Amino acid sequence: MTIAFTSGEPSGIGPDIAIIHAQKERQENLLVYCDPDVLINRAKQLNLPITLKENETRKASEVSVFPVKTVVEVETGVLNPKNANYVLEIIRKATHDCLKGQCSGILTGPINKAVINQSGIKFSGHTEYLAELTNTPKTVMLLATGQLRVALATTHLALNDVSNNI
């Protein structure tokens, strides 16, 4: 099984998650949609070994990567609206690959909605964006653990807008 992992905000924790996950032998293949330079630089900062592959891998310290370049250089912990298109592009590419059957699902890394909006792109969140990319008119956000499933009545709305959307 191949899972698409969108690394999210390049200056955030998403690349770290991919690198730390890659340190383990695993059953699934995690295909990381990320700038390879971001992964290499972050692995150096974390003092963890990685080898990037552009194919399936399940070996420890190897990262299967679908390369997408950032627009501007990434500084860890420093948000940059100029990389907003990059953040959306990795989600677009992963979604496209899932729809083509190349991946079994998507695991999304954290993004900063405010930074995307600062770039001039109207963005409310992953749920709505994935719905748009897949031409899905109705969506629900679901939180699940063990035997508990919680579907949210609304997503990404200001509190004063909730009652008008239920």
Give the residues covered by each predicted segment.
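Beta-strand-turn-beta hairpins that frame and shape the catalytic cleft
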Residues: 59-62, 145-150
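Glycine/threonine-rich beta-strand-loop-alpha-helix active-site module
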Residues: 118-140
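Contiguous, glycine/small-aliphatic-enriched amphipathic segments in soluble metabolic enzymes
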Residues: 1-126, 165
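Short, well-ordered alpha-helical segments in soluble proteins
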Residues: 98, 120, 134-137, 157, ...
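Glycine-rich phosphate/diphosphate-binding loop of Rossmann-like nucleotide-binding domains
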Residues: 152-166
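Glycine-rich beta-alpha junction loops
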Residues: 34-37, 70, 146-148, 157-159
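Small-molecule pocket liners
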Residues: 30, 139-140, 148-151
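Hydrophobic residues at beta-strand termini and immediately following loops
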Residues: 66-68, 142, 153
